[in-house]
Design a protein with these regions (language model features):
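Membrane-helix boundary/interfacial segments in multi-pass membrane proteins
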Residues: 9, 58-67, 108, 173-197, ...
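Transmembrane catalytic cores of multi-pass membrane glycosyltransferases
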Residues: 58-68, 93, 103-228
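Aromatic-anchored segments of alpha-helical transmembrane domains
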Residues: 51-56, 101-105, 155-162, 229-242, ...
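Short periplasmic/luminal acceptor-recognition loop of GT-C membrane glycosyltransferases, typified by
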Residues: 301-406, 418-472, 476, 480-499
């Protein structure tokens, strides 16, 4: 996304919407291409359409994660066919599966881990069936190994394009730091997903898919592959539940969109087989009527899925989009409420620019009002939560450093702490008044008039509690900034402090 914005010369926040929509479109085209490899193009078009409708909101909300989710179902079918084939498998098939696994590794690590497990499970299932049918163990293992080897090599080559610096820094993961990313268990992750029980068009389509998978998996390769995929997702949920014993999860709910797409595609195949069955059993004079009814029902279902997604599931995001403030200090409705911190964003940006005399990308900010960071390319000293922090960023150590700075009693003591920090220290502090004095006018010089301390709100990992983060305040004595080494300005609820 960042490279897309750079290419267009846009700010990241402005490029997000077209970037997300572009990924949804590209993902749909590639999904169709992948399905067309394993089924006829007409079927592939319908399967890709069902997948897109089932997961479109995920694509808009998390465009970086949508491709690997949408493509997994057809890739799973390709992998199953490649592993199941008795004669030599075309190299391009193995390379295609490997490219997908590598792509998942550089875009969404959870999907990468699940895809690796899925391919290994498929190989194990096929190996067990072959040995059970009388094949010798060693030749079976050898054949499957040499099918898996190209997949692994290609995926490794693709993944290393992005992962090499991290692997070098962590000594091939032997020195990997603690990571809180897996410490999250929302309500949807605490229960098994049952999309086939929903009382809408997607629920009907998924139920048809479940029935088709159970009836056809013995005689249809596509049904067998998708059934293994669906079963693996539920097994991942079981493993994620067991992981709670170790006070972590496997973020199983992130696989729900894959489940929806796979069952929706299976539902398309089920309905098409049902239509074909009816056309063969009824009088030829009524065959056209059956096709017409099927097309009408399919169109109504597609429109229903689309409208449900836009009108219901997207409603909270739409409300937030209307209320969020732009970098101009107003929101989509034109509101300019001084009680809202976002109203003061332009004044904060102006204060930082005037006091530092530097471009945004030359400044390191210490603030926990992260919406200020959304519109300007400042460097941030601290990430918003430990769950989204780069493991190499040492979130906890940075939080301890901030608390150490807040304990300073004099300006010189604070300066000495900043100079001796093992991290690149911030040159800009954007702190909040304790009374959140949003009614003050920008441009006023000096410190907070009531002499109260200036605050930051930090977050810590609270898993397995819900919510999984805890907020705590860190307060700076305004006196530690009373030095010629600092310049400061009050802007609404903020005090902007710049180190000269």
């Amino acid at each position: 996304g960042g490279r897309f914005a750079n290419l267009l010369g846009w700010d990241g926040w402005a490029a997000y919407k077209p970037y997300a929509l572009l990924w949804v479109a590209v993902t749909a085209v590639v999904t169709f291409t992948l399905w067309s490899i394993v089924v006829r193009r007409r079927l592939a078009l319908l399967a890709a359409l069902a997948t897109t409708l089932a997961g479109m909101l995920h694509g808009v909300d998390e465009p970086y994660a949508w491709p690997s989710a949408a493509w997994l179902a057809p890739v799973a079918v390709l992998a199953w066919q490649a592993l199941r084939r008795e004669e030599g498998t075309p190299r391009w098939t193995l390379a295609c599966v490997g490219c997908y696994v590598g792509f998942a590794a550089i875009t969404y690590t959870l999907h990468f881990g699940f895809a690796v497990l899925l391919v290994l499970v498929m190989a194990a299932v096929l190996g067990v069936f072959r040995v059970h049918s009388g094949r010798k163990v060693w030749p079976t293992v050898k054949q499957l190994f040499f099918r898996l080897l190209p997949i692994g090599l290609v995926s490794l080559a693709v993944a290393l394009l992005v992962w090499t610096p991290y692997l070098v820094q962590t000594k091939l993961l032997l020195d990997s730091p603690k990571n809180a990313a897996m410490h999250y268990l929302p309500q949807e992750g605490a229960t098994f997903p049952l999309p086939m029980t929903e009382t809408n068009a997607l629920g009907v389509l998924c139920m048809a898919g479940v029935v088709w998978l159970l009836l056809r998996f013995r005689r249809n390769e596509i049904a067998a592959a998708l059934l293994v995929l669906v079963t693996a997702i539920y097994c991942w949920y079981v493993l994620s539940t067991l992981a709670l014993v170790a006070k972590t999860t496997l973020l199983a709910f992130r696989l729900n969109v894959i489940l929806d797409g796979a069952l929706a595609a299976a539902g398309v195949f089920a309905l098409l087989e049902l239509i074909g069955f009816l056309r063969e059993r009824i009088d030829a004079r009524h065959a056209l009527q059956v096709t017409t009814v099927a097309l009408a029902v399919g169109l109504i279902g597609a429109v229903s899925m689309n409208q449900t997604a836009i009108s219901e599931k997207l409603q909270p995001a739409k409300e937030q989009a209307y209320s969020d403030y732009y970098p101009t200090g107003d929101n989509a409705k034109g509101a300019k409420d001084p009680k809202e911190p976002g109203h003061w964003a332009p004044a904060v940006y102006a204060a930082v620019g005037q006091l530092t005399g530097k471009d945004p990308q030359e400044n390191i900010l210490l603030t926990t009002d992260y919406k200020l960071m959304s519109f300007k390319p400042y460097w941030g000293f601290q990430q918003e939560t430990p769950h989204y922090a780069n493991p190499l960023g040492e979130y906890d150590q940075r939080a301890d450093e901030i608390k150490r700075w807040a304990a300073a009693k004099t300006p010189q003591q604070l300066l000495d702490m900043l100079n001796s920090s093992r991290f690149a220290p911030p040159n800009v502090f954007v702190l909040k008044h304790p009374d959140n004095a949003s009614g003050q006018q920008s441009g006023q010089q000096g410190q907070s008039g009531d002499g109260g301390k200036l605050q930051l709100t930090l977050k810590g990992d609270a898993f397995p509690q819900s919510p999984n983060v805890r907020d705590y305040d860190v307060a700076f004595d305004p006196a530690v900034f009373q030095s010629p080494q600092f310049a400061q300005r009050e802007v609404g609820p903020y005090t902007v402090i710049v180190r000269r």
